[in-house]
Each structure stands twice: as C-alpha cells, then as structure tokens.
C-alpha cells in the first residue's frame, strides 16, 4: 500500500512539473543554453594533466612510502641509472634500443662502430639558450668524480673496439654481469638484449643494445633545457636512422609516455566528429516517419543537443574547479549518450501514447508522469554508482576524476532533459497540433487540396488528419512508424513463439558457457602501453624491449635501513640467504669475497670490520663505486657505524610479467616483516603496480554494492519489489557476460575497462528496468501477452537508443589507440549483451518464470453473477438447429 501511495505521489509530482514546463517553454529552453555557454567559456582555462603517475598509479600505496624512505637515504634521482626500470624511470632521460633487421650480431665490428658513432652524436646534441648552448655534458647526472654517468655498455664497446684494434683475443664479455677494464663488476642485463652465450656466461652475440642518457632536472631552467634536449635527442636518432637503414633504432624519453597518452585525444578528433554525424543522422531517422505532421526529426537532433549541453556544462565546471583534462575523458560522451538518448526516446515514446485531442500541456504532463519516474530512478543509480567511484575510496586518480566528471554530466543531463528537451517536446507538440510540417513548420493542406499537387509534393506533405481517423483508431496514428510496426506486427509474435523459445534458451546456455570460460581467464592489465596511441614511440619501444630484454626483471633495490651487525657471521648468513637466487650487485658480498682473498676472516670485531671496509675495500679502485651504497655515521666516541646500506638484485624471468614481478615484491615484503634484518625493496615500477589489483577492483566493487543497496531501498518506491529482483539478476547476467567476452576479446581488466563495467551496470538498468516493470505490474492476462505489451511499449525506445549508440561507437574502433580500442570493445559488448537480454533472453524467460499472471478467481456474489444465454445457430447446409451456451 505504501509503495502504491509513493508511486502515485511521484507520478503526480512529475505530471505537475510537466504541466509547469509546458506553461513556460521559452524559459526552460533558453536557461540551459545560457548556463552551458557561460560555463563553457571556462575553456580559456583549459589544462591538460601532465603526470601519468598521478593519474594511473595508486594514490595510497606502500611503494610510495618506501620511495620516500629510500629518497631520504639514497636519492632515487641520483641512483636511477642503477635502479633500472623500463617505462617508469624517474626524472629526465633519453633511451635508445639499437637492433638490426637481419638479426645481426650488434657486437661485431661494424655495429660496434655504428653504436659508438651514435653515442658520439648524442653527446654532441646542443640546446641553444640565450648566451649559451647546453650539451649533454652540462645537464647530465654526475658521478662522485664529477663526470657524466654513462651506461657501462659504452665502456664495454670502447674496450671491445680497442681490443680489436690491438688484435687482443682474450677480451670477453660475460652476461648478465661483466667486468670492466678497472675491475668493476657491472650488470648489463638491461643493456644487452637477445643474447646468445658460450660456456661460463661468455657472450657469443647480442641482437640488441640499449643506451640510456640520464639528465638532471633540479630546477625549472634545468628541467626546461632537459625537456628540449629530449626532443633534440629524438630528432638526432631519427636522422641517424635515415642515414643507416640497415639498423632499426627505437628512441624513448621520459616525455614519450605522457605525450603518447595525450596523443589519443588528438588522433580521435576526426573519428569523434564522424561519430557525431552518424549519431545525428541515425537519431533523426529514428524519430522520422512517413506522416509529416507526427514525424519528429527535430526531437532526434535536439536530444543530442541536450546531451551536448550537459557535457559542455560538466566540462566547464571541471575547468572552473581546477580539474585537468586527460584522455580517459573520451569515454564521458559515450556514457552520456547511452543514458541521455534512452531518456529522450522514452519521452518521445510516451508522447506517442497520449491522445491527440488533448491540449499540449496535458499531453506533456502525461509524458512526464509516464516516463520521468523510471528515468529519475535510473539517473539516481548513475549518480550513486559513479558517485562512489568519485569518492576518496577510489585509489586510482584517473578513475576517480572520470567518475566525478560523469556524475556532474549525468546530473545536468537529467536537469536538461527535464527542462530543455521537455520544452522542445512542447514546441513540436504545438507544431503537430496545428498540423504543420515537422521539418519546414508549414501548414499541411487537406487531402482534397493535395490531390491537385504534383506527386513529389504529396509525398513530402503526407499526413493523416483527425477527420480520417475513426473513433476507435485514435491510438494507432503512430503505427506507421517503421520500428513500431516491426515490433508490433512481427517481432513480438516471433520471439514468443513456442518453437523459437528452445533456441533462445540454448543460445543463452552457450552465452553463459563462453562467458564462464572467459571469466576464468581474467587478467589484470597494469601495462602502461595499453593506454597510449598506437604507432608511437612508446609502443615501438615497449615491443622491442619485451622482445629483446625480457630475461631479467627490473633492478630491485635492497635497502637495509637500520644499523645491523654486519661483522656477525649469523647476520652475514641471513643477508646472503635473503639475496640468494638473485643476480646480485652487492657491496656486502664483494667485501666478504675481498676479505677471503686476503685470507682474512669475515667474522671480525666491529672496529676492524668497519675500518677495513672504509680504509681498504672502498679505497680500492674496482670497489670505490660502492661508496654510494653505504652510509656511515660517527658516534660520540668517534666510533664509525654503518647506519644504512643498499644492494641491487635482479630476478631471472621467462618474460617481463608484471604479475610475476608483483608476486616477487609481495614475497620480499613478507620476508622483511619476519626477518631479523630490517629491509625494504624498491623499484620505480613498484609505484604503479603496488596495490594496483585492489585499487582497480575497488571502484567496481563499491559501485556494485551501492547499486545493490539502492535497488534494495528503491523497492519501497516501485509498485512491486519483484521488479528489483529481476533487475538485479539481469545486471549480474550482463556483467558476467561482458567480463567473460571482454577477456576472450583480449581486453585486460585495467582502469578503462573497470570504468566501462561500472557504466554497464547503469546501462543495463536503463534499458531493462522499464521492460521488467511493465511486465511485473501487468495483471489478468497471460505472461506472453504482457511480454508482448512490454516490448510494444518500451521496445521502440530501447531499439532507437541502441541503434544510435552503436553507430556512434563504430568510428571509435578505427581510432589508432589502445585506449580507444579498449573503450570500444567494452562499450560494444555492454550494448550488445544488454540488447540481447532485452530482446531475446528476458522476453523468453519471463514467459515461464514468476510472477504468475493467472486470473484471480472472483468471489461469487449477487452483483457478479454469470448470465447464461441460449443462442440458436442454424446450419444452412443441413438445416439443423444447434444450441450454443455462451457466457456473458
């Protein structure tokens, strides 16, 4: 009873609102336009988000805390050349991979000379500034001896060249650790790629060589010069490529990921314009019919104008509040399109059900009462699900900003549909009531006048006048609409046919089977190359890197951040045990080996251990570089202690798998908690992958929970709680299918796909809720009858919005970008699976599942008695008289 009272009360409120808007259409049409123009003017403050880490790395993670601790001990910007990472290296740098088209050995004489020539060209790059020309020597990261840090492979190649010049045959390169001329042991696993080795790790050949040039960015001027140097670096490498066509060179800089991420927006522009044109065309066609008076092409266009105004308003608010644009915002218009188009088409469908002899204000009031309640509830669902995604619970900033922008856009879209589109409906209603042409707004002449006109004129001005319509045919004036005719005359009977139902059930079982197969293979995508445009430096570099340099993980820093008893043999065993199984670049292990070579016990007293470390080991040229890895402190009694130190570890991997690397990170962290030695591990790439899985799933998880809560509480607003049960089951079925087929279509669960899945919850409710509501609330007739009725009432609006949405999505598939490719595949699957449920699964399943539609037996009473009438029927052929008993 309470539900019915609330339901009727809300319908009455919307009816009065519709009547009020119909009474003041000019104001409600102009106000949204003025607001959009005023807020849209804020595009003069348009800004683009520069930091990819800010957008895509989890905001709250242990890796960021570890980075701060590491920075306080050993500044990452100074040690980034030793903490190698592919795409996540901090600061400014230029990087290049050199390979050969014929898979030649890059260590032979020709290619060695070529690479050294490229190195010389890079170091001579000049960045002109007023009064001074900066070269690499001026902006490079410096060693302790004030020389530029250059990759060790350059020294190896120079030694190799000198050995060939002097005919020395005893020079050998080992892999992944080799020794330089001065005796230093260095790691070259990320500098030599595609390596073939002899016995004892001696390198036979290498198919690729990677060089990295690290730059300073300690102040704004330095950063600006470094940025320009990176640009000149790419130009120099490309020129070198043109003059040496037998080698393939892949340049990459610290700016490449950011530029290629934002490049998606630029390459998408013409495709989005094409999409807009297609949607406008389809919307106009969907609202058109042969009857030139009742056709509503302008409403199709104005529906898109409504969505555009709402999007513009939301963008203006984001700009005014200091928000910055990023390429993930490309999905917002499609979120708006899916929600806004259905709302406008549902209003138009409700308009067609009103009586033509009513006044426009009364018809508008009926439209609002009929369609705005369900549209308001679905809008509330959008606001709740995206609102939870926009909350601080969302740990990935790109997802939070997207949800926040979508919330604002959805809210204004709802308000503008109520006001702008509603007033547009009023204006077209007056045009219809005055029998004016729906496009040209010219009075349509009566049929007797049209008979005297040419055929083309009669075709353009075909209309059905009320005088031609019989009293009982009033409701059928819109049946000449193609989609209405198709659903009512053909599709509804076909889908509910007894012989069709088994095939639909079979298709659904196949759908569930394939969805389950994909669901069991879901993988999380934390690869940053999945969000950039294709045919870019990032994609080319990443492809080459994965091909040639996938044998070892990024270099992991192993930091002991408190003073421990390094001289104690048990502590030594613990430290060696923790690092066992890794390729190690360790001062500690080198020092212990140094002591053994001197026939000195490693179990020395503290003072002797420390003094020999400082005064002997670190003064030896081949070990002097380890001074950067140890922090000493003097106590009050002049006793020296090692307060912190670091080592570098590299894991052997079959391929650079981020999930495998994350598992390694978690294993080392668990070990650090239980071990006697307090240490942390860090690599710049950990900032992106730490808690990425939980951060990624949190918005979807929270949105699903909030959607369930909203469906539960909205059960008091709908006339029957069974509606919400059916909606929940439908959403689960759709989301399960989308996730499964998304995986089979090689789409990983990343930031973009999670946002699409949140949208999929709302899109499903948008389209399925009216169908289910009409079916559940239907009484007296059979299930089949109410399934047909639900399709006839709401199917046209669903079909119209689906057609417009799909034609708008297709150009997105052609955009040369991984981000838009993910966006297209997810949105297409959401639309297709939802359509499949609306027009196939639900119409069939509802015909044999609850609620029951059996006619309740009426109590016998004096006012409701059956009257029996005898009717005599004469059989003409046999002249027999037949008595037939009929019930009246």
Curated annotation (Swiss-Prot):
Keywords attached to this Swiss-Prot or TrEMBL record, sorted alphabetically, are: Cell membrane, Cell projection, Glycoprotein, Membrane, Synapse, Transmembrane, Transmembrane helix
The Gene Ontology CC terms held by the record are: dendritic spine; plasma membrane; synapse
On tissue specificity, the annotation reads: Broadly expressed in the brain. Selectively expressed in the thalamic reticular nucleus (TRN) in early development and continues to be enriched in this structure throughout adult life.
Upon gene disruption, the observed phenotype is: Mice show decreased spindles and sleep fragmentation, learning defects, hyper-aggressive behavior and motor defects. Selective deletion in the thalamic reticular nucleus (TRN) leads to attention deficits and hyperactivity. Defects are probably due to dcreased TRN activity through mechanisms involving small conductance calcium-dependent potassium currents (SK).
| SUPFAM superfamilies xrefs | Multidrug efflux transporter AcrB transmembrane domain (SSF82866)
Q: What result follows from mutating residue 303 to R?
A: Results in defective post-translational processing and glycosylation
Where can this protein be found? Cell membrane; Cell projection, Dendritic spine
Alphabetical list of PROSITE patterns matching this protein: SSD
Protein name stated in the entry: Patched domain-containing protein 1
User: In which organism is this protein found?
Assistant: Mus musculus (Mouse)
Gene name on record? ptchd1
